[in-house]
């Protein structure tokens, strides 16, 4: 019988990252775990619908035995079974992030007995989680270089707080993992601005694009009007294509916040990324830790290691026989496997 791993949910960022990472790693390694103090660092601690959906999805995919899987629970026991490929559908029932549920279960399906399709309904444009276009255009091309083949499709947008979005991913078992080396991003090739609108006046998007264009030389400026029933909602994105990597940054519009202020938040984030020579942004760094650990080697550079990143590394090191090295040089942090 494999040893039970005990985790403290208040560790590090004190949010849902510990739980999501633990679920992924437990399914992959077969090691059971308990976690207490789930989301202890949040104003509303315990399992929300998004986290509960991730737990139930993980349990279904590997036929796990679970205790404490209920809304508001701050303690969970998860004893995994064998990961099975198949066609899965999960509904969050709120505007909780579809992509965070997918990111919990997809790594386990890299080790399944056959190809899978996972469809999740809920929120697709959520201020606290990467949107589907980030997964599709930034993360998945890098995963493909590592020998991981998955394809995400956004079937319907669902903006916070209403939800109603649908995202699906097709994924195949991984034959072998390749290492990823992302020490430098290289020169910028082009930058693309994009605005999504649903039930919001077009002039909002035009003002947001104008704000982006006032700070950056944009090779493309795209405005996409979605059906009104997918809103109301507004997301502004800026994609930075460099020689070695494409990064994508986003901000979700809010009621009573002007278009200029929304876009200015995005400008500030992109300028912070461009001010350093780091290849990887904050969100992407979180997502690369697990596949890099499974490959057993690789490296990337990030401007500042976030609390999410450090928490993720700590959980990975509890489940896998790897150790990460973080070395700061010339204003960037180089993250690698020792």
From Swiss-Prot:
Record-listed ATP binding positions: 103, 283-287
- Tell me the organism's taxonomic lineage: Bacteria, Pseudomonadati, Pseudomonadota, Gammaproteobacteria, Enterobacterales
Briefly state the protein's biological role: Catalyzes the conversion of 3'-phosphate to a 2',3'-cyclic phosphodiester at the end of RNA. The mechanism of action of the enzyme occurs in 3 steps: (A) adenylation of the enzyme by ATP; (B) transfer of adenylate to an RNA-N3'P to produce RNA-N3'PP5'A; (C) and attack of the adjacent 2'-hydroxyl on the 3'-phosphorus in the diester linkage to produce the cyclic end product. The biological role of this enzyme is unknown but it is likely to function in some aspects of cellular RNA processing.
Q: Name it.
A: RNA 3'-terminal phosphate cyclase
Ligase keyword on record = yes
- What are the GO cellular component annotations? cytoplasm
- Quote the Pfam families the UniProt record gives: RTC, RTC_insert
Organism expressing this protein natively: Escherichia coli O9:H4 (strain HS)
Q: Which NCBIfam families match?
A: PRK04204.1-2, PRK04204.1-3, RNA_3prim_cycl
């Amino acid at each position: 019988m494999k040893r039970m791993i005990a985790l403290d949910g208040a560790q590090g960022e004190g949010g849902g990252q510990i739980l999501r990472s633990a679920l992924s790693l437990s399914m992959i390694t077969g090691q059971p775990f308990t976690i207490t103090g789930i989301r202890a660092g949040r104003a509303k601690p315990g399992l929300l619908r998004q986290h509960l959906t991730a737990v139930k999805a993980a349990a279904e995919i590997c036929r796990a035995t679970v205790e404490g899987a209920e809304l508001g629970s701050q303690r969970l026991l998860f004893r995994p079974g064998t990961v099975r490929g198949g066609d899965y559908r999960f509904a969050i029932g709120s505007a909780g992030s579809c992509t965070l549920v997918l990111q919990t279960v997809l790594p386990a399906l890299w080790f399944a007995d056959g190809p899978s399709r996972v469809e999740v309904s809920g929120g697709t444009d959520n201020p606290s989680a990467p949107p589907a276009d980030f997964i599709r255009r930034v993360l998945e091309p890098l995963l493909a270089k590592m020998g991981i083949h998955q394809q995400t499709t956004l079937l319907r947008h669902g903006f916070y707080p209403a939800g109603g979005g649908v995202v699906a991913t097709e994924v195949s078992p991984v034959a072998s993992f390749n290492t990823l080396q992302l020490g430098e991003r290289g020169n910028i090739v082009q930058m693309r601005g994009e605005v999504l609108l649903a039930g919001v006046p077009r002039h909002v998007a035009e003002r947001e694009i104008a704000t982006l264009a006032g700070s950056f030389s944009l090779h493309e400026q795209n405005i996409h009007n979605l059906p009104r029933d997918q809103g109301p909602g507004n997301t502004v994105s800026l994609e930075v294509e460099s020689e070695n990597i494409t990064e994508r940054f986003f901000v979700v519009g809010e009621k009573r916040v002007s278009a200029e202020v929304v876009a200015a938040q995005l400008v500030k984030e992109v300028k912070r990324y461009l001010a350093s020579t780091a290849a990887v942004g904050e969100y992407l760094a979180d997502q690369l830790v697990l596949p890099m650990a499974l490959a057993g080697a690789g490296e990337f550079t990030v401007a500042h290691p976030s609390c999410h990143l450090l928490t993720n590394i700590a959980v990975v090191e509890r489940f896998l026989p790897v150790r990460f090295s973080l070395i700061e040089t010339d204003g960037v942090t180089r993250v690698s496997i020792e």
